[in-house]
């Protein structure tokens, strides 16, 4: 799983026993793309390295995938900006760097297309986590 990335990063997966047999009706390619975008965000925003944990849980017909890192985290201002401006694509402000924010936009669109929700949380210097929640097939 860690092949092809710097030794400064470790990626771990934790699948809760109750999630092992949960079923999510989805486009696997798109869900993989969303997860990859979140992992790449952790790597990109933590050039000094970090630990990235992907965890999968299942409770009451909800499948929850969390991508968390112990990197630089998010300031309250950046967190608010991500919530208020889910992406910069719609902006006509030429001062904005359009390379930023598009990965999260794509993740949000993929999740919502699958009837799910996305929540970003983080604390400055304590890491960031993105929680994707989906209704699972019983």
Feature annotation, model-predicted:
Residues 3-15:
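Short conserved segments within the C-terminal catalytic ATPase subdomain
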Residues 23-26:
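Conserved micro-motifs of the catalytic ATP-binding
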Residues 42-43:
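Short helix-loop "hinge" at the ATP-lid/N-box region of the Bergerat-fold HATPase_c
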Residues 69:
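Acidic ATP/Mg2+-coordinating residue in the GHKL
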Residues 73-81:
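Short helix N-cap motif at coil->helix boundaries in the Bergerat
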Residues 103-107:
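Short alpha-helical Gxxx[C/S/T] motif in the catalytic ATP-binding
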């Amino acid at each position: 799983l860690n092949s092809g990335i710097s030794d400064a990063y470790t990626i771990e997966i934790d699948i809760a026993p109750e999630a092992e047999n949960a079923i999510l009706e989805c486009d696997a390619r798109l869900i993989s793309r969303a997860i990859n975008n979140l992992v790449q965000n952790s790597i990109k925003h933590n050039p000094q390295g970090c630990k990235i944990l992907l965890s999968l849980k299942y409770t009451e017909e909800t499948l929850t995938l969390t991508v968390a890192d112990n990197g630089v985290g998010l300031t309250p201002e950046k967190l608010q900006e991500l919530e208020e401006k889910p992406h910069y694509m719609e902006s006509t402000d030429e001062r904005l760097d359009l390379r930023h924010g598009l990965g999260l936009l794509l993740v949000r669109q993929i999740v919502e297309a699958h009837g799910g929700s996305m929540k970003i949380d983080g604390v400055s210097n304590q890491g960031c986590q993105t929680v994707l929640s989906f209704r699972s097939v019983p």
